[in-house]
Amino acid sequence: MTREEAKKRIERLRELIEYHNYRYYVLDSPEISDEEYDKLYRELVTLEKQFPEFITPDSPTQRVGAPPAKEFATVTHEVPMLSLDNAFTEDEIKAFDQRVRSALNQQHVEYFCEHKLDGLAVSLLYENGLFVRGSTRGNGYVGEDVTANLKTIKTIPLRLKGENIPPVVEIRGEAFMMLRDFEALNEQRQALGQPLFANPRNAAAGSIRQLDSSITAQRKLYFMPYGFGLVQGMDFETQERFLKQCQEWGFRINEHNRKASSIEEALEFIRYWTEHRVELPFPADGVVIKVNNLRYWDILGTTAHAPRYAIAYKFPAEEKETKLKDVVFQVGRTGIITPVAMLEPVVLDGATVSRATLHNFDIVRQLDVRKGDVVKLKRAGMVIPEIIGVAAEKRTGKEEQIEPPTTCPVCGGPTEWDGAYLKCVNITCPAQLKGHLLHWASRDAMDIDGLGESIIENLVDMGLVKNIADLYKLSVQDLLTLPRLAQRSATKLYENIQRSKDRPFFRVLYGLGIPRVGLKTAQMLAEHFGSINALLNATMDELTSIEGIGTDTAETILKALQSPQVHELIDQLKTLGLKMEQESIEGPLKGLTFVFTGTLTSMSRGDAAKLVQSLGGKVASSVSKNVDYVVVGEDPGSKLDKAQKLGLTIIDEEAFLKMVKREHNG
């Protein structure tokens, strides 16, 4: 084949593959078999290897995933990706309509109704029709660059179809997993001994936030647009027209979307799908109602965190009944023994549920729940399955009381009561160690990708790891002794463990699992004391001087820090090279200290603190003369009074957002 013939064949293969991708993933109407498709794809791969000069960014082969990234770059949203205000009743929807009509001085307003997909909000930037960047929503102002991962999603066109294409358009929508694919993924993970995803949203978010996009490529993800950000050279006029244009460009559109000539028609849409949501193939937790006329959007405007032209109605939590077959006892990293109900599998809000926590033995007594009972189940916040009651009228007399274990169900050691909680007091209990290791490897702590529950189980059971520090002493050869871990996976896990040594001090502190030290408290302690040595020498007065740390918490922290085992572990981690001092990040806010008070509307105070820290600034927990800016939200506390007395610079949320956006953009 000549070079010119190869070029023509490559172009034709791309056209064919993208056409069949569109038929399969967008229209759900394939014209060829999987085998025929694979044959075309393999031919394209072969030709592009022979003639790499003809590879283009929009080639179907570029979906398979880029080399693993060390971390995600940040992306500033030129048009903020705002969240939506929620409504839980029809009256709240009617009140929204009243506000809209009053602001527009209109008797009737046309709306557009869409399902609120339950996945991960992402943004796709196209320049002259070519997909050039994809990012997560993040805090609405700054997200993460996940372009390589989003390229693997077949319902995201790498190049827009048709001729009506603006120079720049930013498409926003939801990346999600179909319910059938979520079930299949969890079945596969269960067979491999991997931890299961709690729901399709977590599965989608976890897949897109993979540093290795080849993993994302293995997951069956979909994308549907719902809005736009930056647009140049085009006016869509209505939400309905915008989505129609997206369809013409090659995106998959929800066929159930409907235009409503009045709020009553919108309510009919809500009522129908509240009753029929189980028929949907994708996860949806509500309905979004938007003013259809885009000209009205500018008139209605936005608040700091949500548009005034749209509202999200949240479906009420679904309840189901099922049989409680048995109760098992789990031991957590702090030794608390939790009763867990094993259930006859039941589909609840689109996910199969076969177990639910009973929290503690006080709850067991209050519910009077017994083995063999028919129990009432719902998903708290659409995430955690929770038993809310018992169908006592369905009892047969064969039900059995649930008795607390007299010894630890894992190590057989002694137990003791701590209020409503039963605890194993054996500090060498393998279950506690496994819990500590899981916590250490978690995203908010050391974020060790690949160190999941099944690997930790094997590391502990095989005696390879007896404390957290032992993780950093493992070799690739040690990891190769684990079941089902091949050379490539073992090498990658080893590298991920070693790479975690670079995590900042506050995450090490959080990862230690000190009782009552959550992520926020760990950040405050790291900021206040600056090093592990200073913290180990802290006094009660020093701890309680930090806002949010009371006497009980301070006593618990001091007691934990005085433990010989904690001292020994910290010494080992120091020797192994983990960070035990707070580092200052280079950035435009370096040298500036911020304090937040009151409720922020655009993001949580935690997200605001992360934003400041990512730009090199510091966040203090209390007001002092060393503070440069006090950011005031709604209902500020005593910090505002103190700041005024000290004559500090006080700014509102809007000024803060302008400041960080300006600094982030340089």
Swiss-Prot record:
<feature type="binding site">
    <location>
        <begin position="34"/>
        <end position="38"/>
    </location>
    <ligand>
        <name>NAD(+)</name>
    </ligand>
</feature>
<dbReference type="Pfam" id="PF14520">
    <property type="entry name" value="HHH_5"/>
</dbReference>
<feature type="binding site">
    <location>
        <position position="314"/>
    </location>
    <ligand>
        <name>NAD(+)</name>
    </ligand>
</feature>
<dbReference type="InterPro" id="IPR013839">
    <property type="entry name" value="DNAligase_adenylation"/>
</dbReference>
<keyword id="KW-0234">DNA repair</keyword>
<keyword id="KW-0235">DNA replication</keyword>
<keyword id="KW-0464">Manganese</keyword>
<protein>
    <recommendedName>
        <fullName>DNA ligase</fullName>
        <ecNumber>6.5.1.2</ecNumber>
    </recommendedName>
</protein>
<dbReference type="InterPro" id="IPR004150">
    <property type="entry name" value="NAD_DNA_ligase_OB"/>
</dbReference>
<feature type="binding site">
    <location>
        <position position="114"/>
    </location>
    <ligand>
        <name>NAD(+)</name>
    </ligand>
</feature>
<feature type="binding site">
    <location>
        <position position="290"/>
    </location>
    <ligand>
        <name>NAD(+)</name>
    </ligand>
</feature>
<comment type="function">
    <text>DNA ligase that catalyzes the formation of phosphodiester linkages between 5'-phosphoryl and 3'-hydroxyl groups in double-stranded DNA using NAD as a coenzyme and as the energy source for the reaction. It is essential for DNA replication and repair of damaged DNA.</text>
</comment>
<dbReference type="InterPro" id="IPR018239">
    <property type="entry name" value="DNA_ligase_AS"/>
</dbReference>
<feature type="binding site">
    <location>
        <position position="174"/>
    </location>
    <ligand>
        <name>NAD(+)</name>
    </ligand>
</feature>
<feature type="active site" description="N6-AMP-lysine intermediate">
    <location>
        <position position="116"/>
    </location>
</feature>
<dbReference type="Pfam" id="PF03120">
    <property type="entry name" value="DNA_ligase_OB"/>
</dbReference>
<dbReference type="Pfam" id="PF00533">
    <property type="entry name" value="BRCT"/>
</dbReference>
<dbReference type="GO" id="GO:0006260">
    <property type="term" value="P:DNA replication"/>
</dbReference>
<dbReference type="InterPro" id="IPR036420">
    <property type="entry name" value="BRCT_dom_sf"/>
</dbReference>
<dbReference type="GO" id="GO:0003911">
    <property type="term" value="F:DNA ligase (NAD+) activity"/>
</dbReference>
<feature type="binding site">
    <location>
        <position position="137"/>
    </location>
    <ligand>
        <name>NAD(+)</name>
    </ligand>
</feature>
<dbReference type="Pfam" id="PF01653">
    <property type="entry name" value="DNA_ligase_aden"/>
</dbReference>
<keyword id="KW-0227">DNA damage</keyword>
<dbReference type="InterPro" id="IPR012340">
    <property type="entry name" value="NA-bd_OB-fold"/>
</dbReference>
<feature type="binding site">
    <location>
        <position position="424"/>
    </location>
    <ligand>
        <name>Zn(2+)</name>
    </ligand>
</feature>
<feature type="domain" description="BRCT">
    <location>
        <begin position="584"/>
        <end position="666"/>
    </location>
</feature>
<dbReference type="InterPro" id="IPR010994">
    <property type="entry name" value="RuvA_2-like"/>
</dbReference>
<keyword id="KW-0479">Metal-binding</keyword>
<feature type="binding site">
    <location>
        <begin position="83"/>
        <end position="84"/>
    </location>
    <ligand>
        <name>NAD(+)</name>
    </ligand>
</feature>
<dbReference type="GO" id="GO:0006281">
    <property type="term" value="P:DNA repair"/>
</dbReference>
<dbReference type="GO" id="GO:0005829">
    <property type="term" value="C:cytosol"/>
</dbReference>
<comment type="similarity">
    <text>Belongs to the NAD-dependent DNA ligase family. LigA subfamily.</text>
</comment>
<dbReference type="InterPro" id="IPR033136">
    <property type="entry name" value="DNA_ligase_CS"/>
</dbReference>
<dbReference type="GO" id="GO:0046872">
    <property type="term" value="F:metal ion binding"/>
</dbReference>
<keyword id="KW-0862">Zinc</keyword>
<dbReference type="InterPro" id="IPR003583">
    <property type="entry name" value="Hlx-hairpin-Hlx_DNA-bd_motif"/>
</dbReference>
<keyword id="KW-0460">Magnesium</keyword>
<dbReference type="InterPro" id="IPR001679">
    <property type="entry name" value="DNA_ligase"/>
</dbReference>
<dbReference type="InterPro" id="IPR041663">
    <property type="entry name" value="DisA/LigA_HHH"/>
</dbReference>
<keyword id="KW-0520">NAD</keyword>
<keyword id="KW-0436">Ligase</keyword>
<dbReference type="InterPro" id="IPR001357">
    <property type="entry name" value="BRCT_dom"/>
</dbReference>
